[in-house]
Every structure is written in C-alpha cells, then in structure tokens.
Amino acid sequence: MKDEYKDYFVYFAIMKAFFLDRDGIINQERGTYTYKLQDFIILPHVLEVLLRLKDLNFKLIVITNQAGISRGLYTKAQMNACHDFLQKESQNIIDDFYYAPLHPEVSESLSRKPDSLMFERAIAKYDIAVSESYMIGDKERDLVPARKLGIATIILGHTIFTKYADYSVKDISGVLQAIGF
C-alpha cells in the first residue's frame, strides 16, 4: 500500500457494552413511574458496580421504556433531570441513555422494549460487539430484544432463570461474579 493512502484507512475498535434497564436496576422500582428527583433513589452497590464495569472497558448504556411521557404523566425534562442526577452522582459514568417515550395505548413503537430498536441504535452508534456485551433487566421484556440480537442477558431479583436469561442474580452486586469478573 502506498504511504499516501495510509491516512484514509481508519481502524475502529469494536466496543463491548453493558446495557442496563433503569427502574429496578439502577434506581428503586416504585410500582409507578419514577420521574421526580425525590423519588429517584439509586439502589445500593449500583455506583460501585458501574465503576467496575467502566474499569473493564464496557460502554454503559441505559435502555428504558418511559411511557409516562406519552401518557402525559411527566415530561422529557423531568426524565432528563433524573438522568442528570444519576450522572452527577456517578461522575458521568453512563455513556448514553436511550428511552422509548411511547405507550401502546397512545402509539406503537419499535423502540419500546421488547422491540430492539433502542439497542440497534446504540450498537450502530458505538460499534458494539454484541457477542461481548450484556443486558441486565428485572423483567423478561428487558431481555427479549437483547437475546434476539445475541447479547448475553442477566435477570436481576429472580432466583430462577427465565428462558431469556443467561444469568440470574439476586442484586446488582452479583453481576460481576456472574459474568466472570
């Protein structure tokens, strides 16, 4: 190859990612929508585990359904305030947030889990190697799109495996051991 062409070739590192559902994984699940800062309570061990995953060179990407927006229960600004709070508390450790604001009662969306569009967008944006990546969720619908795309799946809070979970952990502190770190 001629030296004059060498600068035209760009080599991209394939990134590994850790996808996380939000409510019930990062912050306390309330049973209703979490959109007020006073209700956005980061669960124990979350920040330590995220820091360790970052040290292991994982991209950290939150994938969350936020149907309360389309139902008029809260605004994107309120949701973003919760995400900004998480970033402040974690020293900006999350690489990106993907959210699906629609609810089936209002409008169908391929972004909304269990569909996979939010994952596909992140994979394309960050050149993610799905075979080296993980998704953690507390519901089967969190795991379905990841499994469809070849991402290893972890269910949290369940003592038994579902057909969509590759790993099962009691709480987030068990994630690193489950995946061999």
Question: Which role does the model predict for each range below?
Answer:
Residues I26-P44, I69-Q78, N92, L102-L110:
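Metal-dependent phosphoesterase signature
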Residues Y11-K59:
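Active-site neighborhood of HAD-like aspartate-dependent phosphohydrolases
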